[in-house]
Amino acid sequence: MGIKYGNLNVDEKYSKILEPNLYFDSILVPGVTYTDKYQTGPAGGIYVHKLDTTAVTVGTPGRDFTDEASSDTLIPILLNNNYMKSKKIYGVQAAAVDFDLANEQLSTATQEIKESRQQSALGCLVNEGTKSNGDAITANAVDAVLDEAAKIKKGKANVVLCSPDFYALVLKENGKDFTPAKNDEVAATGAIGDLYGFTWIRAAGLGEAEAKYYDSTGTLKTVALHKAATTSVDGSAVDFILYNSETLSIIDNLESFRIVDSENFTGSKAQAELNTGMKVTTPALARVRTHTIAKTGA
């Protein structure tokens, strides 16, 4: 479905700038690391699907069908995470801003929004996924991921978001083993590759202390990602998140994307505003591997 575009504050001349800058060099790519599928429900509400399945029992030919009710569940999602950026363009009125300058300023604004949106999504995955704490991983990184994959009973994980430290260990131990079609990109960027049916992605945001997002109830969540230990309290760190991309729903609504005259200084402003809803619809399909950092005191 992609991004929902409003029309009140969106200049169509510039709207094509948004998606390349929002998705380029991003860990959030629709259809790859999350799903953006949704449907509109009563009173204009936005709903995402959680599809549950049941096994088929073997029988003999010639038997009758046994009907069962659909187990498809619609889950409401609120577009309650707001990201906005306004960049000043001095000395030029909005009508006189050439396209290249508008492109530069709106692109920068979008990329800054992208970073915050990515961090929120990591917080959503860590907070709403299934936790799995263990010892610090210093060797056999791929084995640790495969161990978590075995715990996902139904459905198949296809994405591994790795902390910088964990991804470095993966590359040291298994860099030569990545699928050849993607191996050139791994060698060039050190950021993404395919191995054992998973897309492995370096998520730099997992090295940050925390992430914030508003959950589907409208509650602001502050999620610890890498909490340093103190002399009296243990710390913790996320090693990786293993999940099925269909279980992370992210819906975007472009609220504002425009060049407008400034009322405060001589010039104009490049403004971008995005409202986003995010939810892990099936927590069992998202495994969050963490380890404890021992306190430094005696």
PLM regions with names:
Residues G45, V159, D239, G267-K269, ...:
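A residue-level signal for beta-strand positions that form part of recognition/binding surfaces
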